[in-house]
Amino acid sequence: MRDRVAMMLRPLVRGWIPRAVLLLTVAFSFGCNRNHNGQLPQSSGEPVAVAKEPVKGFVLVRAYPDQHDGELALALEFSQPLAATQEFDTLVRLEQGSGNHDGGWSLSDDAKTLRYPYVEADKHYTVLISGDLLAATGSRLGKSRKEPVYTGELDPVVGFASRGSILPARGSRGVPVVSVNVPEVDVEFMRVREKALPAFLARYHKAGQRSSWELSNQGNSRKRLSELADPVYVTRFVLDGKKNERALTYLPIQNIRELREPGLYFAVMKPTGSFSDAFETAFFSVSNIGLHARAYKDKLFVHTASLRSGNPYKQVDLLVLDAKGETVLQGATDDNGNALLNYTLNAGHVLVSRNGRDISILPFNQPALDLSEFAVAGRENPWFDVFAWSGRDLYRPGEMLRISALLRDRDGKPVKPQPVFLRLKQPDGKTFRETRLQPAEQGYLEFTQKIPSDAPTGRWRVEFRTDPASKEAVQGLAVRVEEFLPERMKLELSSAQPVLRAKAPFTLTADAAYLYGAPAAGNRFTANLAVAVEQHPLDNMPGWFFGDATLQLPRGAKETIDITLGADGHLVHDIVLPEEAKPVSPMAVVVSGSVYESGGRPVTRSLKRVLWPADALVGVRPLFDVASGADANGMARFELTRVGVDGKPQSAKGLKATLVRELRDYHWRYSDGRWDYDFTRRFENKETRTVDISSSHTTTLSLPVEWGDYWLEVFDPVTGLTMRYPFRAGWSWGDDNRGLDARPDKVKLALDKTSYRAGDTLKVTITPPHPGKGLLLVESDKPLYVQAIDANPSTTLEIPVTADWERHDVYVTALVFRGGSASNNTTPARAVGEAYVPMQRKERRVAVGLVVPKQVRPAQSLPVTVSVPELAGKQAHVTISAVDAGILNITGFPVPDAAAHFFAQRRLSVDAYDIYGRVIESFEGGTGRLKFGGDMALPPLPQAKRPTARSQTVDLFSGAVKLDAKGNAHIQLPVPDFNGALRVSALVYSDTRYGQRDAETVVRAPILAEASMPRVMAPGDRSTVTVDVQNFTGKQGKFAVKVEGVGPLVVAEAGRSVTLGIDGKTTLNFPLRALEGNSVAQVRVRVEGNGSKAERHYDLPVRAVWPQGLRTQAHVLNVLAPIAFDPALAKGLMPDSVNARLSVSTLAPIPFASVLQGVFEYPYGCAEQTASKGYAALWLDDATIRSLGIQGVTPAQRLERLEGALGRLASLQTTNGHFSMWGGNSDVNPVLTPYIAGFLLDAKDAGFAVSDAVLQKALNRLSEDLLSGAHLFYGNDQSEALMFAHQAWSGYVLARVNRAPLGTLRTLYDNERGKAVSGLSLVHLGVALSLQGDRKRGEAAIEAGFAKSEGGRPEVFGDYGSVIRDNALMIALVRAHGLAKPAYEARVMALGRDLQARRRSGWLWLSTQEQVALAQLGRALLVDQKKQVSGTLYVGKQREDIAASRLIGRSFDAAALARGVRFVPQGDVPLYASFEVAGIPRQAPVSDDSQLLVVRRWYTVDGKPWTPGPLKEGQALIVRVSVTSKQNMPDALLTDLLPAGLEIENFNLGETRQWADVTVDGIALSERADAADIKHEEFRDDRYVAMLQLTGGRTANLFYLVRAVTPGSYNVPPSLVEDMYRPALRGTGRVAPAMVTVVQP
């Protein structure tokens, strides 16, 4: 009988029955077809029409039981949506009065269905529905009704109740199974082969539901289950449980003889009679061995303990298996259950412990124990250390970065002098510069680097290494590069309330003052208040969630204060919390306060307090990865606790924990010209349990979940509050290596001292969560001390402190083990305690005296005196920094502290693993009965070109100064013309001792004159210069104030006279107007009186709000005749913006000069653009600059640009030799690598220092691509053509250095040339063949290339090319390598005619690739040109005789054009002349949406559309720019200039918490990164810039925040989007409104 049943079960479990049924069905079908017609009857039958009366009005459609996955609810469906504000519990009741629950009836998302979950199965209910029930339309139901509903039976369900894999051998009742209405289950057991353990555990980490496909699939190089495990037993169990009740039953596997052999078993279970493809699975080993392992650098400490008693388990055999199942290490534990093995951790290995029939298995691919609740964080502890510091951590582009550092060992002691290698990394993680530093006296290092003016903004990093090849940096320092203005004021917000209570006001205290020492008397102060659900109200409980995360609160901040400060700048104000802040959940209440300068620019600070709705709150800690979610078809596990405001646990009785599932009903809708889907939500209560919590322990809750979205609700009857925690199950169903079940219980450790030294005795008091045997360890990167302990509450133990503790990564660790017993439902467990052991280093910190004046005047020396008596007579140094406090306050930069760094706590360098988190739990439940059984079974984006103002930043540094014999130093620092406060900080160091001190000095002139104005202006803007004048001369007086504009600025009412008393202050407003111009203007302020004067100069850029245009004329001179510049070319352009150029050449009119200068000044910097700018710098030598008449390019600029390009390309190179477009995670396009490698070769040939490592890596990459033929362009529509182009260009570059294999080039020509779609690729291949010696094939390929180019080329196929780029490069290449022919030369004229035609259109857009190709062609043409041109140039009456040259070029401004420009040529005709005028039009360009639709919209801070009107000073707006492209555009660039009176809120610097929850058209600002594919974005002084990828037909949404700052009326610029490599593809947005006005409040 047993064998027969076993044979019946096997096909069921393995999924054979469905296949068998299918085969029988097919067989019968074929059998019927033997007689073609057989006895086939005639078609008959008439449809029966079922009359369906339409539902009219508001009525009850049906009342029914709604059951899903074993959970019941009564459901009432109505014909129309219900009014949601009704009291459903009053209007709808159960006739059984005792069954009614307050808040029981819930309304579905579509508002048509009411659900009531508090019902039982197999029971009759009567629902009483009041006739007063209202529809959303206002209709009444009209008549009360009684509706009977029978709930019926619950659906059958069964599953393993534990995710554990260790079944205690003693005192266990078996494997727990939870079931509903399942009387019997069939279970198959398989034993995993020992050599297959690593492979099995790599695939099956956890119990859960699996399909037959998962159990038998061999995909992804995985073995089938049958190859890992052998079937050993199959049986049927009878389960406990009453009908319609959830039951827990233990499967008594310990009684089965076939499962007694030591090993790991895999169990597969299904309900008897079920034909589903889903199986419940679990794996386990039966053991009494509790296994705990601690991994050090090269050691593994193992402790084995009895799972029954917690006592040490001695003489346990240990072995480590590698991924193939081979034994790599053997050992055994001693009589104390301990073993120390020489072993380095490997995640693919498995530790097996065995003693007799007991076996426990520990895979190292599981997470280490989670010790996040212990203070074990810190940096690593290598053999040497570097303390790096700077005067500040915030810099502007273009400033000098200065870094100091000290080289020491891990304890701050000297090391042998040796070079240190420094890397400066950009925000994208790429290296900008790498250099070697040699320590000076006492290990001092210093590094300086000018930050390029076009540097990418963001967080830069300085890293230090002793080995330049090391991937990991030992130490580093982060600095921020942003466009900022130093603050002029300081603001402190505080509150005496540690937490807030409902209905009580929030008492805010604000103190504001100017940094130069005066209170903010009469200044405006505003405050906004925002509330949000606070799920983490206690900082000391990370990972715990409180409150109701589903609570809907108003988004955005509301203004609560707008007042003028008193004479002392002090304010105390009670803020009434909004009505929405009801005491139903903890809430974060964030006040953002701003004090305003007289000119309107705010200084903002934030203060947060938490509103507690009750004295105690219930919290939940998910025992799974919060980001990934719980496992689908498994158990979602949680810990529950209840804590007070002080964070101390409190007990709780009768908590109601409910698992709620969110269901979504999807439906399609047609909108915006396409189909999309939407959904309505409804919720089902899956399970409700009553939970008690003690004050000393948390409670664990395990709930079965499927795939989908859930809430865990916990109702506290004492407070009446409900905690709701939403989570998802099955989000990362394929990731089994996750989960927080490794989080241990906590042992409290208390040390008797704050620090120790060798020779001391450390006393530690242990308070375990449960008594038990355990271990006390002292650890660093190895075990220093181990002792067995009996842990009881308040156990105190002593440990001797030895010399090897003298380091900063020493921890005391306590392990306490608890035995388990089924009789009292106790599961074996371990608890962990960690305490850092600080070493005594007080004697190595020295006291520093720092004397500075309390106040100094600008433009004088600041005397600094440092005294360190403890270092008298010893060698020591000091560095002094004096930095504007207005810079330091922006980021809260702390005073550098070397002692705090060197003696800081290092992280715990131990990873611990054990099996206790996977012990199968003991629950209350019955035992299953065996029915039968058997033995067989189953970018940076540098700033756009613009006039750039200089911003004064004060950062003074002394360098390393030696202390004299008395330990003193006297230093003078030159203070610039500046009013404010300097934080003066001293850092003192000797060989082993350190100290620091800081003080503040006010810098203030006798007459203080500070002006505020916009950061930028546009022609036609009207604004205000606000001047604060304060009298610090010590006597009353009359003061003359004069303000004037230099450049395109006009200041009205420029002269004033004021009388001020002692310390008196006044604020004057001067109207300011910007004229036409495109330059850096100045505002100059002069104040005189009482024998003193103050002069201040402020740069103020004036720039247009739209881009420049290009106008050209071209002439072919067939006779020698004078030519003149037509002044009409500059008509309608702003004179200051005009840049005109005359070019006369004996060659075809190639715009050699303009393209060279254009690409040299190109503002952006991806890999391609960087190489292109490098080419321009390379070719702009002195002779070329003189010949072309190019202005504004000095040799120093050329060298800086070239070296910058080489450095940036090095930072963009990836590990495989290709180049990242923008760095970081941006795309790598292999097509660019040969172009960049060619530039590196050209720069090297020209004598510049090119990194050989970068060049060789690039050449090696090209060689691999050429030889392997590996396909690199999958997904491209013309991938084969692109691959051919890439290989051909690679071959050409390699052939230049004789590294292109001739055989490979021949094969490419013979077999692949038909794939070419551009002539350039064939020319590249032809030149490469010729250089490598096969001139015949080479010339044939070149000829074929020129022939193909006559037919054009695809507009886009991924090579950044165009007809102009390809033709220019082809001609330049054959000329450069002596392969030119007359037919090829004729292409020059055709190219010139094409460019002339473009010029005549009025706009000549050229990509950087086209500009470089034209420049290269121009150079090639000039090399062999014999003809020359000379002549006389007249500018007005001024005459210049120009010597003969192949090309003559001169540049002019608008004034020269107005005087008249005429050239009289001499030479052989024909000659070619071109006139070009670039400038900014006076009239705004017409919006253009032919290729790109660009729409800018403005919103208020609560996410509502802004109605245009005057903006109050300080008012903030959200800007949304929507971009829709008609075609794919992977390299789009958005430039959104700001109106002058508005300033952008830099999300990298400002407080963003108050904006995080704001939603604009359904998009939360906290999720704005998902609204567009942004590769890089920057917040600049006057613009928002983003590089993004656009998909044809889809809309990208970009957001940023602006604030109205300076009163005035300002032009609104249009938004501009362009394709960086196809400049003709661009879109200009409409401007609405055309002007923005900012007014004072």
Swiss-Prot record:
Pfam families on file: A2M, A2M_bMG2, A2M_BRD, bMG1, bMG10, bMG3, bMG5, bMG6
Cross-link named Isoglutamyl cysteine thioester (Cys-Gln), sites: C1166-Q1169
SUPFAM superfamilies: Terpenoid cyclases/Protein prenyltransferases
Lipidation (S-diacylglycerol cysteine): C32
GO molecular function: endopeptidase inhibitor activity
Location relative to the cell: Cell membrane
Keywords for the protein's UniProt record, in alphabetical order: Cell membrane, Lipoprotein, Membrane, Palmitate, Protease inhibitor, Signal, Thioester bond
Lipid-bearing positions (N-palmitoyl cysteine): C32
Principal subcellular localization: membrane
Keyword Signal listed: yes
Membrane topology: Lipid-anchor
Domain of life where this protein originates: Bacteria
GO cellular component, one term: plasma membrane
Annotated signal peptide: 1-31
Task performed by this protein: Protects the bacterial cell from host peptidases.
Membership in a protein family: Belongs to the protease inhibitor I39 (alpha-2-macroglobulin) family. Bacterial alpha-2-macroglobulin subfamily.
Name by which UniProt lists this protein: Alpha-2-macroglobulin
